[in-house]
Amino acid sequence: TNIQQYLVNTSKVDFLAHRGLLKSLYGEQHPCGKIVVEEDYHAITPEVLREFYERYYHSGNCSIFLSGKVTEDIISRVTDTFGTSFGQHQQPASKLSFSFTAVPEKRIFIEREDAMQSAVKMGYTTITRNHPDYLKLRVLMTLFGGYFGSRLMSNIREEKGYTYGISAGIMFYPDSGLLAISTETDNEYVEPLIQEVYHEIDRLHQEPVS
């Protein structure tokens, strides 16, 4: 069940570190930083799901995107099939905006005594998809930690041997982007691994990419 899967996840250091990162960057009042607890699953009832479905699953909230060699015949067929109204409501859902505030602490430690390894999550909020530098940032993050031959992998995995895998990427939310670095390592390598991440960040600042 979902509850069982949740309980399994809460025993994993990667899951706990990811939640801790989001909570520390966005705060508990922001949807991204709100931490789900077991009681939240028990509060979900058929009535709650039915009300949610009726309120939000309707043609007023539906958009259709076509790509490729789109002809008038295709548009006509799509319109005939999906173009009619459905659902009990037609009012589009309002788009809410949430402010967020990061905690002042730069490091958050989540203890789990029986853990064989430590999960390391590093990140900060960044630009959204509609920013003019979006594509440039995507290219930079690919170089930094987005594939097997990235700088993080070459240094921290191949050269130093601190981890089997480390990655960096961007997650996008409606009002924010999140740049995150993720890995797991032996407890003894946590500090030197973090220092090497900072070293690679400094390289991006100081050395032109070739």
At which residue positions do the language-model features occur?
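Phosphate-proximal small/polar/acidic motifs at interfaces that engage nucleotide phosphates
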Residues: 153-154
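His/Glu-based metal-binding/catalytic segments typifying zinc-dependent metallopeptidases
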Residues: 90-150
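Charge-rich, well-structured scaffold segments of protease-associated domains
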Residues: 1-92, 109, 128, 158-210
